[in-house]
Amino acid sequence: MRKVAIYGKGGIGKSTTTQNTVAALAEMGKKVMVVGCDPKADSTRLLLGGLQQKTVLDTLREEGEEVELEDIIKGGYKNTRCTESGGPEPGVGCAGRGIITSVNLLEQLGAYDDEWELDYVFYDVLGDVVCGGFAMPIRDGKAEEIYIVCSGEMMAMYAANNICKGILKYADAGGVRLGGLICNSRQVENEKAMIEELARKIGTQMIHFVPRDNFVQRAEINRKTVIDYDPTHKQADEYRALAQKINDNKMFVIPKPLEIEELESLLIEFGIAN
């Protein structure tokens, strides 16, 4: 079972990218579980046809200790297994701790057991590595390969670099490695070349460039992944290509994060700061 975590700046399109990629892997015949690690609990909605599933933390609050695996995992597109960790009530508690509680409970209830014959588990993780809880999939070896969703926008690249610092910090302890950058295009000038260069400097690869297409939003409005909504659309082939590249990937590295000056000079070199 391959344990994958998807990180990236808030609003970059992590959940959309994760679900569309998982749909492509499921279409290939892979058995995949998605663990949403975001208090918004929107990491599995498209795989579940728009269903906002009840989160692990909400279930624990209502049911107490008497929780069964089927209470917190729902079957999604092509037999994907979907669960959402959820978060505390707004203004109370720590969302990072919620992830730790949820993943530990999933382990106790046997969600990762051999009987499920999982090929992949995907963790879709909120925003930047802002606190220890959100770093948990990296820190505790829950995830072994990380993909960072970014774009040619400055803050997305800044966040990607910060996430690399988190991977570097825990690489020895948890055995986690960076599998590559996924460029979710924002149609920034020289975007593809810039992210390829950022990846090279960090010591990794841009595993795929996902072009911007409003069809993704159309599929989302219809509560589906692109592959589910229209498997013949060209954007569906982009996610298939990304899924295939992840499936075939052999390049797993300990990243070399850039100093802020290096990052800024990269932006200047490609004309963003001009």
Swiss-Prot record:
Homodimer. Its cofactor is [4Fe-4S] cluster. The key enzymatic reactions in nitrogen fixation are catalyzed by the nitrogenase complex, which has 2 components: the iron protein and the molybdenum-iron protein. One of its GO terms (molecular function) is ATP binding. Belongs to the NifH/BchL/ChlL family. Its EC number is 1.18.6.1. It comes from Chlorobium phaeovibrioides (strain DSM 265 / 1930). The modification ADP-ribosylarginine is found at residue 97. [4Fe-4S] cluster binds at residues 94, 131. This is Nitrogenase iron protein. It catalyses: N2 + 8 reduced [2Fe-2S]-[ferredoxin] + 16 ATP + 16 H2O = H2 + 8 oxidized [2Fe-2S]-[ferredoxin] + 2 NH4(+) + 16 ADP + 16 phosphate + 6 H(+). ATP binds at residues 8-15. CDD domains: NifH. Binds 1 [4Fe-4S] cluster per dimer. Keywords: 4Fe-4S, ADP-ribosylation, ATP-binding, Iron, Iron-sulfur, Metal-binding, Nitrogen fixation, Nucleotide-binding, Oxidoreductase.
